[in-house]
A protein has these predicted regions:
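A transmembrane-helix-recognition feature enriched in membrane-embedded lipid enzymes
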Residues: 1-42, 70, 110-119
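Short, flexible loop segments at the rims of nucleotide/cofactor-binding pockets, characterized by
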Residues: 18, 31-38, 101, 132-138, ...
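Short amphipathic alpha-helical segments and helix-helix/interface helices
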Residues: 26-30, 88-90, 113, 147, ...
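Helix-to-loop junction immediately C-terminal to a conserved catalytic motif
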Residues: 29-62, 72
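Amphipathic coiled-coil/heptad-repeat helices and related helical stalk/stem segments
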Residues: 40-43, 108, 140-144, 170-174
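Catalytic core of membrane glycerolipid acyltransferases/transacylases, capturing the structured
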Residues: 51-135
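Internal catalytic-core helix/loop-beta-alpha segment
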Residues: 122-167
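A cross-family acyltransferase "interaction/gating" segment
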Residues: 152-157, 162-212
Length: 212
């Protein structure tokens, strides 16, 4: 399908560049998910009935980037009407109106996270922690506006735990967002990524794991 080289998404990102970034990262992660490890997908057939905007995926969190990359893979496959499997060719026609909420400080750590911002990051300032230290600050209204813009534009992923540590309770901010914006909420459970990848999700830690 021809893509207008000048068209931009709701955050001003050029869609042709965005598509290229998603493809390159998808190429790398597809091999890691489906060849170095194996990934089992359950329930993706429900994606076919979702609207194109106003959907919030609420997931647990095991790595900074592998989790969200896996969801992008599943959404790309669904865009090509493939459910519960991710054929390699679906990388060539990714879903472009997907966004993920991430801590601003995480997205500034190195060139790869900065590139991943182009894939659809909605970077926000954490109100409880920064640079490894506890903080206590008010929510930035601009962050709420950006999240609202993402939801109005497409599908949005959030990790309410706000950390990759296991068994941490989700932050109340997600509940407030749901009450205010009233999106279609889709719960997601992931597993196996902590065993397979390091904390960032950029480096493989072990092979042959089952990812869910």
């Amino acid at each position: 399908m021809f893509l207008n080289p000048f068209k931009r998404d709701s955050f001003g990102y050029n869609l042709l560049i965005k598509r290229s970034v998603i493809f390159v990262f998808g190429l790398i992660t597809w091999y890691r998910f489906f060849r170095i490890n194996s990934m089992r997908i359950v329930g993706a057939d429900k994606l076919r009935d979702l609207p194109q905007q106003g959907v919030l995926f609420v997931s647990n969190h095991q790595t900074y980037f592998a989790d969200v990359s896996a969801m992008y893979q599943v959404f790309n496959a669904a865009e090509n009407k493939r459910y519960n499997s991710v054929p390699f060719l679906t990388l060539f026609r990714p879903k472009l109106n997907v966004y993920f909420i991430a801590a601003a400080e995480t997205m500034k750590k190195g060139i790869l996270p900065k590139l991943m911002q182009y894939a659809g990051s909605v970077s926000i300032k954490r109100t409880w922690r920064e640079a490894g230290k506890n903080v206590n600050r008010s929510v930035d209204p601009k962050d709420i506006e950006n999240i609202k813009r993402a939801m109005e534009s497409g599908w949005t992923i959030t990790f309410p735990q706000g950390t990759t540590r296991p068994f941490v309770k989700g932050r109340r901010g997600t509940v407030h967002l749901i009450k205010e914006l009233k999106p279609v909420v889709v719960p997601v459970v992931i597993d196996g990524f902590r065993r397979a990848f390091d904390k960032t999700g950029l480096f493989v830690k072990s092979n042959g794991n089952l990812l869910n």
